[in-house]
């Protein structure tokens, strides 16, 4: 009996000894799974002060990288050979520019459309001389804003909302992609992209007009109508709402009427009908809207459609497809040109193009080769 009991005890001890590593492995796996589940729940939680989301996991490092490199480049980047002819252009503040004239100079024309990360250059100095920071900033920035737009869709999905906010943000995304990516691709080099700065933006606009006469494009004109018309409509809507506020019963007439609104209240905060009647008498009855839903849809759709049109105009101009533009009127039977105010724009465009021409001097070979030419 003693031997059997000892054998039993010994057997039980050995089984416990072999089961300990397995239990430890299972506990470690459970901890790893729990950590991953906690991370997933934190990423997709709508209780956070700022929603992260899975697209936010992609957006945050890209935006931080673009912002960090932009700040360093606009402060201390060395001159860049943008035209690829050995004439560097300084754009940083430490190179003598101020906050208005400073810009991140586009990647050199010698690079073209090639992918140019740091490890493709022979040295950091060569990478900086060829404008590598511009490509790094632009690519990370575009990935970041596209991820931000998808993050808006993700948050709307989590909250059970419709995806119209994400759809509206496609307008600035389309404009950024058109100017920073599609236009340089159409022109064959990233050096044709917009410099990242205040004066660089205006220089890009003037040069774009000189090369493509974008002011005569109907798509650009639709963009102007959408942006300025949307701003006018938003100002009208805000002023009408402020003018027709309904005073709350909890506030006396001596208090400001602006204190009468609380987030989530059931009763309306302004008189929609009074605002529409005002528009009837001010402009025209057809200008008014039957309900606030159609009004707010119009306020969102007008500028978004306008920016889409302007971005499409830039995309078409990128590949030099200018057949949609308005050209100078001409009497075909007599061959006579009808002069209009558009001629002034054409003259200005020609002047800008002449001022921006690069002067490349070709010297004779006998001067560049160092040979002595006998005097005759």
From Swiss-Prot:
Keywords: Chlorophyll, Chlorophyll biosynthesis, Chromophore, Magnesium, Membrane, Metal-binding, Oxidoreductase, Photosynthesis, Thylakoid, Transmembrane, Transmembrane helix. The chain crosses the membrane at residues 51-68, 140-155, 164-178, 219-240, 298-312. GO terms for molecular function: chlorophyll binding; electron transporter, transferring electrons within the cyclic electron transport pathway of photosynthesis activity; metal ion binding; oxidoreductase activity. It is an enzyme of class 1 (oxidoreductase). The record marks 212 as: Stabilizes free radical intermediate. The record marks 183 as: Tyrosine radical intermediate. InterPro entries: D1/D2 (IPR055266), Photo_II_D1/D2_sf (IPR036854), Photo_RC_L/M (IPR000484), Photo_RC_L/M_CS (IPR055265). Homodimer. Due to differences in the C-terminus this protein cannot bind the oxygen-evolving Mn4-Ca-O5 cluster bound by 'normal' PsbA, however it probably still binds plastoquinone and chlorophyll. Synthesizes chlorophyll f or chlorophyllide f (Chl f, 2-formyl chlorophyll a), probably by oxidation of chlorophyll a or chlorophyllide a and reduction of plastoquinone. The reaction is probably light-dependent. Chl f absorbs far red light (FRL, 707 nm in 100% methanol), and is synthesized when cells are grown in FRL, where it provides the advantage of extending the spectral range of harvested light in terrestrial cyanobacteria. When ectopically expressed in Synechococcus PCC 7002 (which does not grow in FRL and does not make Chl f) produces Chl f (0.059% of total chlorophyll). This is Light-dependent chlorophyll f synthase. It comes from Chlorogloeopsis fritschii (strain PCC 9212). The gene is chlF.
